[in-house]
Structures are given as structure tokens and as C-alpha cells.
């Protein structure tokens, strides 16, 4: 294995300092491959907080460069600052919460060398700590590894080619960057990367998670033209089908109950049909595709899943209506 000089960039806020300390403690074998750690911490608005974050430098023998800001800065800007301050040829990213596998960097370097790549995108897996978290994760992320910025290892010249992160978004900047990277360097997306583990939802209740879900979806960087067209097509199909159902017995069967074309309760049938399609896809097919063991759920747990899924879908609809262009 060829020696590589790697900078680890971590963005955080002061409120998450205890999680940042836990992350640094659990870098384990990954430290062998790191030349420096760049921590960008915002919300450091007092002298005592400055003292507290500087104690991070004493946790490891490796060079830890701490950059602090009084105001809270967005995740994209935090990463951009870390990139500019980094000194080495390769950059890898972590966030405060997901914890990396102890052989994460070794595994990623192996993939780079075997496939002659300039970078690999990170992956993350969500692990619940209670039944509510299990239902929420099953309704959203699922249990298959999903691509993400944390865990990414990339050559700096490729990063410069792809471009930096959108600095002023509270969320969605990572999705935008991944979409951009897929166009410029699709080989960044590789199977076999050891995923970071996101254990639990850090004590957030359902209301907090709904607010975060709305914030993420309303700021999510998507292709608004294609997404709007898809919504338009589905809406057009459903509306036309319902209008046809409402007028079928009137226009086709002339309300003659003896007619071959008369369909009793056709409106209720069509509404029930679309509801059934939604239910089967959203509550069964989609979770299975995300490696959720849906058939292991008991009745109460399944009802919770249905409730959470419907609420989140309504939030997603509202977020789409209010989508920030």
C-alpha cells in the first residue's frame, strides 16, 4: 500500500463537543493513515468555550488544527473552510455524529489502489436504540448503506474539479455536491466502502425530527423541473382517473343499474384503490427495498410505522410546495 498524506476535515458546533470528543476517541486504526485533523467548530462565543475546544489538541499525538467561529456557520461553509485550511494531498470528511469503522480509511485506500481511483464516496448506516427510532428509520432512511459525504476520501485536485460545497444552506448541500460529483466523476460511487454507523437519533423527539425533516426537504437541492414534472404527471393521472370514475355511471351507464356498464360505488372504489396502492408501496415495498424487516413488526409497531410515514409524507408535500428555488 502506497503511503498517502491525508487531512481529516470535521465540521461541528460547540453544542456537539461531547460527540466530537467521542468521535476523536474512536478513530482507532484510522489514525495510522492521517497526517492531520482539521476541526472547524462554530458557536464558540466565549473565552471558556475556546479553552474547552483547545483541549482537543491534547487527546491525540497527531496534529489537530482547530478553527473556531463565534457565529454558527452552515455545514457546507464549515467543510469549505476545512478544505482550504488542509495541507495534504488527500482529504477525508467526517461529521460529529456518525462513527467510522475502525478500518474505514484502510479499506477506502485499498479500493482506490485496486481500481486506480481518485476518490470514493462515504456511506452511512442507521442503527436504532429503541422502537420509536426503529419505526422512524424504517420510514425514512432504511437499513441499507446510503451514500453520504461523511466517510468520503478524495484527492484534493479532484475536489477542486468538482467544486466546493454550497456554503449558505442549512441542509441539502451534501446532496447537491453528490449530484454534481456524479456528473463529473461517477466512479466516486463505489460499493464495498465500510459505512459509518449512525447510532440512534441523539435524543430527538418526533416533533424535532419532523422539523428537521421539513427543513431538509424544503432546502433539498433537487432538479425542480424534473421533480415538478413527475408530480404533475402523477397528479394529472390521478385527477383524470377520479373525474372519469365520478362521471362514469352518469355519462356511460346513464345511471341505469341494469346496464352492463354500470359500476356501483365506483368513486369509493377508485379512492380506495389509490389508497391501497399508496399503502402497499409506502408501507411494504419501499421498506423492503431499504432492507427493513417489515414482516417482523408486530401490529402496534406497524401502526406506528404507518402513522410516522403518513405524517412525513405530508411534511414532504408541504416542503415541496414551499421549496426554495
Kindly give the residue locations of the regions a language model identified.
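Catalytic donor/gating beta->alpha subdomain of glycosyltransferases that bind UDP-sugars
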Residues: 166-170, 175-227
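Short beta-strand/loop segment that forms part of the nucleotide-sugar
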Residues: 35-45, 67-69
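A recurrent flexible, glycine/aromatic-enriched loop bordering the glycosyltransferase active site
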Residues: 137-154, 170, 205, 221-229
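Membrane-embedded multi-pass helical conduit in multi-pass membrane proteins
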Residues: 236-321
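Conserved donor NDP-sugar-binding/catalytic core segment of glycosyltransferases
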Residues: 99, 103-132
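Short, well-formed alpha-helical segments that are part of the catalytic scaffolds
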Residues: 14-30
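Glycine-rich, basic loop-to-helix element that forms the pyrophosphate-binding segment
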Residues: 69-86
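Short aromatic/hydrophobic "clamp" motif used to bind/position activated sugar donors
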Residues: 91
Amino acid at each position: 500500500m502506497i503511503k498517502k498524506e491525508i487531512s481529516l476535515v470535521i465540521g461541528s458546533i460547540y453544542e456537539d463537543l461531547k460527540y466530537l470528543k467521542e468521535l476523536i476517541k474512536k478513530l482507532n486504526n484510522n489514525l495510522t493513515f492521517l497526517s492531520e485533523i482539521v476541526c472547524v467548530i462554530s458557536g464558540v462565543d466565549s473565552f471558556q468555550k475556546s479553552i474547552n475546544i483547545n483541549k482537543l489538541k491534547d487527546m491525540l499525538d497527531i496534529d489537530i488544527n482547530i478553527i473556531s467561529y463565534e457565529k454558527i456557520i452552515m455545514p457546507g461553509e464549515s467543510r469549505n473552510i476545512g478544505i482550504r485550511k488542509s495541507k495534504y494531498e488527500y482529504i477525508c470528511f467526517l461529521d460529529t455524529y456518525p462513527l467510522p469503522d475502525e478500518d474505514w480509511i484502510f479499506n477506502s485506500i485499498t479500493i482506490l489502489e485496486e481500481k486506480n481511483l481518485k476518490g470514493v464516496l462515504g456511506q452511512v448506516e442507521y442503527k436504532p436504540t429503541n422502537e420509536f427510532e426503529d419505526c422512524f428509520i424504517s420510514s425514512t432512511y432504511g437499513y441499507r448503506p446510503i451514500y453520504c459525504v461523511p466517510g468520503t476520501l478524495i484527492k484534493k485536485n479532484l475536489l477542486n474539479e468538482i467544486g466546493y460545497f454550497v456554503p449558505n444552506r442549512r441542509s441539502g448541500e451534501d446532496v447537491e455536491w453528490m449530484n454534481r460529483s456524479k456528473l463529473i466523476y461517477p466512479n466516486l460511487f463505489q460499493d464495498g466502502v465500510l459505512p459509518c454507523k449512525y447510532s440512534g437519533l441523539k435524543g430527538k423527539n418526533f416533533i424535532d425530527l419532523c422539523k428537521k425533516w421539513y427543513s431538509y426537504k424544503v432546502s433539498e437541492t433537487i432538479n425542480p423541473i424534473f421533480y415538478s414534472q413527475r408530480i404533475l404527471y402523477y397528479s394529472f393521472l390521478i385527477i383524470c382517473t377520479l373525474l372519469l370514475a365520478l362521471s362514469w355511471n352518469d355519462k356511460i351507464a346513464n345511471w341505469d343499474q341494469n346496464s352492463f356498464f354500470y359500476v356501483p360505488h365506483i368513486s369509493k372504489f377508485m379512492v380506495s384503490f389509490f389508497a391501497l396502492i399508496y399503502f402497499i408501496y409506502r408501507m411494504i415495498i419501499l421498506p423492503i427495498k431499504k432492507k427493513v424487516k417489515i414482516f417482523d413488526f408486530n401490529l402496534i409497531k406497524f401502526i406506528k410505522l404507518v402513522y410516522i410515514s403518513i405524517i412525513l409524507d405530508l411534511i414532504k408535500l408541504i416542503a415541496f410546495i414551499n421549496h426554495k428555488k
